Amino acid sequence: MKILYAASEALPFIASGGLADVAGSLPAALKKEGAECRVVMPLYGDIKPELREKMRYVTHFNVPLAWRNQYCGLFEAEANNVKYYLLDNEYYFKRSGIYGFYDDAERFVFFSKAILEMLTKIDYAPDIINCNDWQTAMVPVFLNVYYRSIEKFRGIRTVFTIHNIAYQGKYGMEIATDIAGLPDYALPIVEYDHNVNMMKGAIDQSDVVSTVSPTYCLLYTSRCV
């Protein structure tokens, strides 16, 4: 089984919280169990030079976002016997820090779309894309809206894992139209309470929804009973 693990942060490259720990350890554990697991993440400006030196340039391509096309460079590296894909756009990611910027919505909509565009450029097709938290929540949405008609994508299944439900990617509806470029029929997928909620979109469009632990799942599903 081939798994592409999509995360906004991962050790040993960069970390701000528990997601990086999971993204740095789970793929290696899955590989030991026989899965072919790879990781995709942004190429941040804060990644240490000694780690950058181990990266290899693969290719570059454009990522369509509504009316714009944005550059994306693709690099790869290996850590803990796992292949990492790092997506480069200096405008979005060459900054001090990972989160907390005024354009975080645009940055991670770009990242989500770039993951799928990357798969059109390389000789690799995962069976499963495991998305994590709101920063990759648009992957299953984009996959179903734009990419299912492409042969390479027809068999791909998605898992969406919630690590921190407090951060859901809530923004104005203009993010869905002017940034994500979703057609009118797809707007209800990400709409919640008259705003964009990217996590809601991922829950709606993913084949499987999971949480970071059974306890976390019980905590939030029990509130819905």
Predicted feature locations:
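Catalytic cores of nucleotide-sugar-dependent glycosyltransferases that transfer UDP/GDP/TDP-activated
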Residues: M1-R223
